[in-house]
Amino acid sequence: AALYASLANSNTGSYGLVCVTYSGNTEVGRKTVYGTIRVVPSRAAPIFSAFDFSASRTDLTGDSSKIISGVSSVTVTIPVADKATSTTSAAIVKYIASVGNATAEAPWSEDAYVYIEVPNAASGTVSVAAVDSRGNQTIVTKLGTLIPYTPPRVSSITTQRANSVDSAVSLQAQGVW
């Protein structure tokens, strides 16, 4: 525990070990050895296992686990009971939420819910990483349902009067929708 505490902000540190030999009360030899001590990241990663998420636009989908590609925002919620912790003297610093290539982060909290909003989500995979002061991470992933969506594109619009003089007008649009 003391070694972890001395490396609260790094996975590596230097040490010096001095070995002194005595004959009675008289020092007869001294040897100093220097080295590097390493924290194994996988053994010192934050303890984190749960979060909740909710996608916007339930008015269209009827279900907060359905994500409309490029339209929905995803709000990640980490309840106090599910907050990340450390058993190796590192401080939990932040959470990073990712939905495909869209990411957002928020600081860790000891006693409050943490909310992270990821705008313009374009994936059904929602991941949250708990990051400690050494930079070690534990990632938890949940799956939502991705609803593909492409906004309409109008490539041309033409108008034409019937018989070139009537008040009725024909409107033609071309594109993808």
Can you say where each PLM-predicted feature lies in the sequence?
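Surface-exposed, short loops/turns at beta-strand junctions within beta-sandwich domains
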Residues: 2-15, 114-124
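Solvent-exposed strand-loop boundary residues in beta-sheet-rich modules
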Residues: 23-25, 37, 84, 99-103, ...
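Short beta-strand segments within Ig-like beta-sandwich modules, predominantly Fibronectin type-III
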Residues: 102-111
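Short, compositionally biased P/S/T/A/G/V-rich stretches that sit at domain boundaries
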Residues: 38-70, 146-168
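Conserved structural position at the C-terminal beta-strand
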Residues: 19-21, 130-132
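Extended alpha-helical scaffold segments
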Residues: 15-17, 74, 126
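Edge beta-strands of extracellular beta-sandwich domains
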Residues: 27-39, 106, 136-146
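Solvent-exposed loop/turn segments flanking beta-strands in beta-repeat/beta-sandwich domains
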Residues: 67-98, 174-177
